[in-house]
């Protein structure tokens, strides 16, 4: 199975470089934003 880091690099890093979000700057990968947007669990992602 692929590691989380390799999956992130392949599928997410283009838009979430440095934990930010180039599409919607208010939805970063900070824990506070993940919780506010209901994306703070593995199953939610």
Curated annotation (Swiss-Prot):
Q: Name one Pfam family in it.
A: Cytochrom_C550
Which superkingdom? Bacteria
The known PTMs are summarized as:
Binds 1 heme c group covalently per subunit.
Name one cellular component (GO) term: plasma membrane-derived thylakoid lumen
Q: Does the keyword Chloroplast apply?
A: no
Give the matching InterPro entries.
Cyt_c-like_dom, Cyt_c-like_dom_sf, Cyt_C6, Cytochrom_C550
State the disulfide connectivity. none
Residues annotated as binding heme c are 12, 15-16
Q: Where in the cell is it found?
A: Cellular thylakoid lumen
Give the record's GO biological process terms.
Answer: photosynthesis
Any one Gene Ontology MF annotation carried by this entry is: electron transfer activity
Please provide the record's keywords in A-Z order.
Answer: Electron transport, Heme, Iron, Metal-binding, Photosynthesis, Thylakoid, Transport
Spell out the subunit comment: Monomer.
Family membership noted in the UniProt record: Belongs to the cytochrome c family. PetJ subfamily.
The entry's function note states:
Functions as an electron carrier between membrane-bound cytochrome b6-f and photosystem I in oxygenic photosynthesis.
Protein's UniProt name:
Cytochrome c6
The record lists the organism as Prochlorothrix hollandica
Q: Please name the gene that encodes this protein.
A: petJ
């Amino acid at each position: 199975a692929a590691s989380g880091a390799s999956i992130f690099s392949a599928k997410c890093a283009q838009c979430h470089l440095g934990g930010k979000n180039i599409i919607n700057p208010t939805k970063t990968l900070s824990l506070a934003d993940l919780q506010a947007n209901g994306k703070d669990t593995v199953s939610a992602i």
